[in-house]
UniProtKB/Swiss-Prot annotation:
It comes from the Bacteria. Ca(2+) binds at residues 104, 198, 239. Belongs to the glycosyl hydrolase 13 family. Keywords: Calcium, Carbohydrate metabolism, Cytoplasm, Glycosidase, Hydrolase, Metal-binding, Sodium. This is Cytoplasmic alpha-amylase. Binds 1 Ca(2+) ion per subunit. It comes from Escherichia coli (strain K12). The active site is at 235 (nucleophile), 265 (proton donor). The keyword Hydrolase applies. One of its GO terms (molecular function) is calcium ion binding. GO terms for cellular component: cytoplasm. Its main location: cytoplasm. Its cofactor is Ca(2+). Pfam families: Alpha-amylase. The gene is amyA.
Amino acid sequence: MRNPTLLQCFHWYYPEGGKLWPELAERADGFNDIGINMVWLPPAYKGASGGYSVGYDSYDLFDLGEFDQKGSIPTKYGDKAQLLAAIDALKRNDIAVLLDVVVNHKMGADEKEAIRVQRVNADDRTQIDEEIIECEGWTRYTFPARAGQYSQFIWDFKCFSGIDHIENPDEDGIFKIVNDYTGEGWNDQVDDELGNFDYLMGENIDFRNHAVTEEIKYWARWVMEQTQCDGFRLDAVKHIPAWFYKEWIEHVQEVAPKPLFIVAEYWSHEVDKLQTYIDQVEGKTMLFDAPLQMKFHEASRMGRDYDMTQIFTGTLVEADPFHAVTLVANHDTQPLQALEAPVEPWFKPLAYALILLRENGVPSVFYPDLYGAHYEDVGGDGQTYPIDMPIIEQLDELILARQRFAHGVQTLFFDHPNCIAFSRSGTDEFPGCVVVMSNGDDGEKTIHLGENYGNKTWRDFLGNRQERVVTDENGEATFFCNGGSVSVWVIEEVI
């Protein structure tokens, strides 16, 4: 795949009502036209809140909108037939499809069980109370509406290591379940935040139970056969032992008919933690570049006071570009969400130019930046806020520019705190470009491109600058950009 470009084609507040799968089928041609060649679908299986579930409250991995469970047959995004039709339309347009894998926890159990638990200090999960409490917990998953179709596996308390609510006595908190697998405490090879960040929410899946790991491998084989997907996005891997995903990825790559694209979400702004995880899984997955996303957030808030020469310092794409999926926003960082770190709209064209037109990393585009989003929700202060996420003008042109002009050797001109630039040399087959941007006043860069680019007329593909720039016989010229803007200069004859 030339210049892979990923679209996250949903957001947290995408409307319910089964609209997404039909929308994707309808938009598939348009994705192809602008240069999107890979899409990340939201969790396609039934969540605990049924037709209202975003998908991260995972209930039944085998219900792709086919069974009357949790008050609905379709998921929030549509039914199984609509899902498969959307995937078919995307594939007809040579667009690879990634499925979202949420196997850290389950929610919405069908039955209670008598269980034994120990209280856990929420601020230091390594502190586990010695007292064992006899109680009941919602830990048994039988999926009665599915009635054993596709899988007869029954989840019970032996499949989980933790829970956040018990009954008889009724109590909320974090509790470690006592069973045959949890004697040593939490799983290892997870993030060390809060002492041990194995537990996140719901019924925490325990990967030390061999039957559980085999069931999740079986599900992967099943869902690949059902959907013919081309890869996976792995949710919340900082809470899942790295050894499990190394093993799981090895398995799915072995049984897949072709190599799968796999990217994991390890949300940490410490690049060392991301590199440690990559080492633990022996480089078998890419990771989203959370440090870079935070840099974009900070730069957009600071304006001209942000030193653009440092925009990639301490990021994964700088440290390990071959394992970095770069992004400007996602469903967790959008306003009013758990990891809220929005990038101001004025800066988004600059940020997208930096991930789409450079050679490093695989860029991910966020659905609302292409199509807009309007919603309201309650903030941390209890107040309700209306949110308007505008369409980012020229984003479709930047994506197209990636396919047409982001080729060849890259040279950086990061020599001014406000105005930076980079060039792509082009190849024998595809032309290159010069990208200039400023977070302050109007900017300019004098760039020597070499004799092969002598006496050429250049224009701004985005149309932000109206003048033409002509290189001298040695291929040197001064290229411009507006203040708080970006320009993509290309040879006029190739537009």
